[in-house]
């Protein structure tokens, strides 16, 4: 089963020893249509709307707040509210979020290159150095580590479930989760 969640932030338990935990809020979602265990799900995110979204809202009889759509594996067999009962027995989750974007970064930050000497007349400090051979192959090989956009990539990690508050829809998982506070992600029940 899969669910859309919002990252609230990190905290720790008051046990001894304390455990670093991440708080996730399960987003209210409506199942629009189900086919073979997969479902089209609508959920609220911001106030963005256009005629395409308005048409889908009218088709599935949704209120204006449900303005985003996703395909998830669900426990539901028919349209309606998303069934969240499997979260009560969940032990391990696969949590998928986009990492924090760090913009255009050099090779030392992006790929942990050592760089060159700092002093003694060196004019090679934070650059990447040679990127190819000679006449053969006469080109840069695919996959060469270079400067470029760093972060904002999908990362999936496994986390243990510490607790789940079904009334407030707050999920507490052990350890850290990628992304910024307020980021939207996806969880899948692994066990």
UniProtKB/Swiss-Prot annotation:
This protein's name: Large ribosomal subunit protein uL3
Subunit structure: Part of the 50S ribosomal subunit. Forms a cluster with proteins L14 and L19.
Family: Belongs to the universal ribosomal protein uL3 family.
Disulfide bonds: none
Gene Ontology MF, one: structural constituent of ribosome
Gene Ontology BP, a term: translation
Domain of life per record: Bacteria
Pfam families (UniProt xref): Ribosomal_L3
NCBIfam families the UniProt entry points to: L3_bact
PANTHER family: 50S RIBOSOMAL PROTEIN L3, LARGE RIBOSOMAL SUBUNIT PROTEIN UL3C
One GO cellular component term: cytosolic large ribosomal subunit
Organism: Campylobacter jejuni subsp. jejuni serotype O:2 (strain ATCC 700819 / NCTC 11168)
Keywords, alphabetical: Ribonucleoprotein, Ribosomal protein, RNA-binding, rRNA-binding
Disordered: annotated span: 115-137
Function per UniProt: One of the primary rRNA binding proteins, it binds directly near the 3'-end of the 23S rRNA, where it nucleates assembly of the 50S subunit.
């Amino acid at each position: 089963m899969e669910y859309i969640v919002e990252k609230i932030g990190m905290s720790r338990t008051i046990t001894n020893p304390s455990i670093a935990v991440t708080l996730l809020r399960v987003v209210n979602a409506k199942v629009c249509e189900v086919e073979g265990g997969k479902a089209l799900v609508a959920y609220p995110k911001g106030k963005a709307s256009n005629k395409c979204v308005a048409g889908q809202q009218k088709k599935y009889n949704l209120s204006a707040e449900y303005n985003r759509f996703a395909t998830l594996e669900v426990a539901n067999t028919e349209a309606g509210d998303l069934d969240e009962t499997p979260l009560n027995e969940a032990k391990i989750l696969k949590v998928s979020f986009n990492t924090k974007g760090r913009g255009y970064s050099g090779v030392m930050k992006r790929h942990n290159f050592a760089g060159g000497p700092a002093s003694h007349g060196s004019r090679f400090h934070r650059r990447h150095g040679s990127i190819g051979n000679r006449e053969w192959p006469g080109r840069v090989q695919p996959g060469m580590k270079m400067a470029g956009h760093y972060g904002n990539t999908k990362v999936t990690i496994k986390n243990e479930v510490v607790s789940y508050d079904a009334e407030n829809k707050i999920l507490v998982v052990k350890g850290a989760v990628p992304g910024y506070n307020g980021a939207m992600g996806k969880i899948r029940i692994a066990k």
